[in-house]
Regions:
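Extracytoplasmic small-molecule ligand-binding "clamshell" domains
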Residues: 4-77
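Short loop->beta-strand "edge-of-pocket" segments that line small-molecule binding or catalytic clefts
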Residues: 8-14, 30, 116-132
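Alpha-to-beta junction loops
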Residues: 9-10, 52-56, 70-79, 121-122, ...
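Periplasmic-binding protein-like
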Residues: 15, 98-109, 155, 173-174, ...
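Ligand-binding cleft/hinge of the Venus flytrap
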Residues: 26, 38-54, 131-150, 180-186
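Soluble non-cytosolic domains of exported or imported proteins
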Residues: 27-35, 60-63, 125-129, 151-155, ...
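Short, hydrophobic alpha-helical packing/hinge segments within bilobed ligand-binding/sensory domains
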Residues: 36-37, 64-68, 157-160, 166, ...
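Acidic, polar ligand-binding/catalytic clefts
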Residues: 38, 50-117, 194-195
Length: 200
């Protein structure tokens, strides 16, 4: 209804969720989810028989994406948001477009092979994500005494890891591989650890 009435859809995108939705070097939003979202916009335009449907792009974070959909600030969110029962009670989801496991990114020579190796160490994850919730629960349940750092986005999480302020970055494996690919020396890094969840 909003698209038909206004001729505009506001699309929420991520700034650093490689390979799903992120800025390229020219500050254009690109990625797998972004491409799918633009196809969905074309579908809406055709279904509503609109001659023109404008789009407005708005950056969102893991912490605010659900709220911005709920309050109508954005019409569609395009990123790597996990479709789970808790979130289905809050917002609607498209059909599944990816399946991932939650793992660790660390330096190859860090000695970190799996989650038990994180006991007593600094670990970073991105605020507002399923990974953050899982990591905090693991820390409490297993009394691992990790110092958990919650960064604002995946780029900041990787920077925290890269600068040595954390020994590992816990996140969806596809996103970890994306961060690893853009590193100065991708060969210095490894995605490791038993997947803590399988998510879509």
């Amino acid at each position: 209804k909003k698209a038909k009435d206004t001729g505009v859809l506001t699309l929420g995108h991520r700034e650093s969720s490689i390979p799903f939705s992120y800025y390229n070097d020219q500050q254009q939003v690109i990625g797998y989810s972004q491409e799918l979202m633009m196809k969905a916009v074309e579908g809406v335009k055709e279904n509503l028989k609109l001659a023109k449907l404008d789009t407005k792009l708005m950056p969102v974070t893991s912490a605010n994406r659900i709220t911005l959909v709920q309050n109508g600030t954005i019409d569609i969110e395009c990123g790597s948001t996990t479709n789970n029962l808790e979130r289905q009670k809050q917002v609607g989801f498209s059909t599944t477009i990816f399946v991932i496991g939650t793992r660790l990114l660390t330096k190859k020579d860090s000695g970190i092979k799996d989650f038990p190796d994180l006991a007593g160490k600094n670990v970073v994850t991105t605020a507002g994500t399923t990974s953050e919730r899982l990591l905090r629960k693991m820390n409490e349940d297993k009394q691992m005494k990790m110092n958990i750092i919650s960064a604002k986005d995946h780029g900041e999480s990787f920077l925290t890891l890269e600068t040595g302020r954390a020994v590992a970055f816990m996140m969806d494996d596809a996103l970890l591989y994306g961060e690893m690919a853009k590193a100065k020396k991708p060969g210095d890094w490894i995605v490791t650890g038993t997947a803590q969840s399988k998510e879509a």
